[in-house]
Curated annotation (Swiss-Prot):
Entry's family note: Belongs to the ClpX chaperone family.
Function as written in the Swiss-Prot or TrEMBL entry: ATP-dependent specificity component of the Clp protease. It directs the protease to specific substrates. Can perform chaperone functions in the absence of ClpP.
Source superkingdom: Bacteria
The protein, known as: ATP-dependent Clp protease ATP-binding subunit ClpX
Annotated ATP binding sites: P139, T140, G141, T142, G143, K144, T145, L146
Pfam families: AAA_2, ClpB_D2-small, zf-C4_ClpX
Gene source species: Prosthecochloris aestuarii (strain DSM 271 / SK 413)
Subunit structure: Component of the ClpX-ClpP complex. Forms a hexameric ring that, in the presence of ATP, binds to fourteen ClpP subunits assembled into a disk-like structure with a central cavity, resembling the structure of eukaryotic proteasomes.
GO molecular function: ATP binding; ATP hydrolysis activity; ATP-dependent protein folding chaperone; protein dimerization activity; unfolded protein binding; zinc ion binding
Sites where the protein binds Zn(2+): C24, C27, C46, C49
Taxonomic placement: Bacteria, Pseudomonadati, Chlorobiota, Chlorobiia, Chlorobiales
Domain ClpX-type ZB span(s) in chain numbering: 12-65
PROSITE patterns according to UniProt: CLPX_ZB
GO BP term (any one): proteolysis involved in protein catabolic process
């Protein structure tokens, strides 16, 4: 039985190259001086040169590489300057300059913080920037939700809205706080990298305020209990989330979501907060006039701007919860002028939306100025801010939009004051006709 001939010492089988006397093509060290030597077609490189090359490349890449969505392992939101963020918000939200500026700075710093975590490698030189969640305080219909929604669209990050009134402590009827993260995952198509850079807007946050200043023997599962449950999520923690929502149960596969870089924006009307602030402001004036001054302070439309963390604590938010919402911004009530501007000025103004719908049917929609003023007057009386504008217009336009698709030759529809008051019909113009007809 013949045996295969062993290669000569120092030579690889099937090769005439001698590997006992090789040297590194970069540093000149021989194979005896290093641990490993990698051979190429016409060159050699030792393990020391490989390690040096890796270190050089790592430093160069960390210095010049910018994060982008194309990076498979590093999704980064679109970073925009605070000034541009504020201007972009102003295209959709009328007024509220102070709130827009505060949001712009807070959001910019938040995503700058994420960027610094990704690219700063030297822990000794790294200053840890703490997370800054946001609390929006303002009457209903002033644009809190719209501000958060517009921010998410502007930055191209996943966004979800959660109603705080549906949340309860674990083990009670209602939604666990983890369902917040489930909805964000769903909004990101279960892309975990995107979800962990998203924005969550928690609406009606004032409704989970402690029901009483005194500790009760009965558990407040939808108030203080929810605040306690939200603490770790707001601050930043790895949370196991059921992918399809619902309650956790044994043997269920969970998705671990790190909330460290998720921006939480909490909003609420905080009815009655102005009275607390007014009483505090009036305490500085003791005597017979203190009660009058308290009433005057409560009536001040800018009283919410004087809110402090102590006021929020007295309202019913626990100190730990307040501490995790360091950026507090207030929104002003909407007056008639602001409502009038909301109707026509923003990119997605209500009047523009209805005009677009009519344009799809080949009809131009026109509102008389006094008709718009009347819409504002009715909405102002309802006291629900900008939400009332849509309700008023929808009631007026529903019959017109029902009939329009069945009408032929209509080129223009004019809404008059009489149409708004209900004692007149809209005026229609038709093709090849100078006459105007009412519906």
């Amino acid at each position: 039985m013949s045996r295969e001939k062993e290669p000569e010492k120092g030579k690889r089988k099937g090769s005439g190259r001698d590997y006992t006397k090789v040297v590194c093509s970069f540093c000149g060290r021989s194979s005896d001086e290093v641990s490993n030597m990698v051979a190429g077609p016409d060159a050699f490189i030792c393990d020391r040169c490989i390690m040096s090359s890796v270190e050089i490349l790592r430093k160069e890449i960390s210095a010049i590489k910018q994060p982008s969505k194309e990076d498979g392992d590093s999704f980064q939101p679109r970073l925009i300057s605070p000034k541009n963020i504020m201007e972009s918000l102003g295209q959709y939200v009328v007024g509220q300059e102070r709130a827009r500026k505060s949001l712009a700075v807070a959001v910019y710093n938040h995503y700058r913080r994420i960027e610094s975590q990704e690219w700063v490698r030297d822990a000794e030189d790294d200053v840890v920037i703490e997370k800054s969640n946001i609390l929006l305080i303002g009457p209903t219909g002033t644009g809190k939700t719209l501000l958060a929604q517009t921010l998410a669209n502007l930055l191209d990050v996943p966004f979800t809205i959660v109603d705080a009134t549906s949340l309860t402590e674990a083990g009670y009827v209602g939604d666990d706080v983890e369902t917040i993260l489930t909805r964000l995952l769903q909004a990101s198509d279960f892309n975990l990298e995107r979800a962990e850079r998203g924005i969550i807007y928690v609406d009606e946050i004032d409704k989970i305020a402690r029901k009483s200043a005194n500790v009760s023997i009965t558990r407040d599962v939808s108030g203080e209990g929810v605040q306690q449950a939200l603490l770790k999520i707001l601050e930043g923690a790895v949370v196991g989330v059921p992918p399809r929502g619902g309650r956790k149960h044994p043997e269920q596969q969970l998705i671990n979501v790190n909330t460290r870089n998720i921006l939480f924006i909490c909003g609420g009307a905080f009815e009655g907060l102005s009275k607390l602030i007014g009483r505090r402001v009036a305490k500085a004036s003791m005597g017979f006039g203190s009660k009058v001054k308290a009433q005057q302070a409560e009536a001040d439309p800018e009283i919410l701007q004087k809110v402090t963390q102590d006021d929020l604590h007295e309202y019913g938010l626990i100190p730990e919860f307040i501490g995790r919402l360091p950026v507090i911004s207030t929104l002003d009530p909407l007056d008639a002028k602001a409502l009038r501007n909301i109707l026509v000025e923003p990119k997605n103004a209500l009047v523009k939306q209805y005009q677009k719908l009519f344009e799809m049917d080949g009809c131009e929609l026109v509102f008389d100025e006094d008709a718009l003023d009347k819409v504002v007057e009715i909405a102002l009386d309802r006291g629900t801010g900008a939400r009332a504008l849509r309700s008023v217009l929808e009631n007026i336009m529903i019959d017109i939009m029902f009939e329009l698709p069945s009408m032929t030759g209509v080129t223009k529809c004019r809404i008059t004051l009489g149409t708004i008051n209900g004692d007149g019909l809209p005026e229609f113009s038709f093709e090849d006709s100078d006459t105007k007809k009412t519906a």
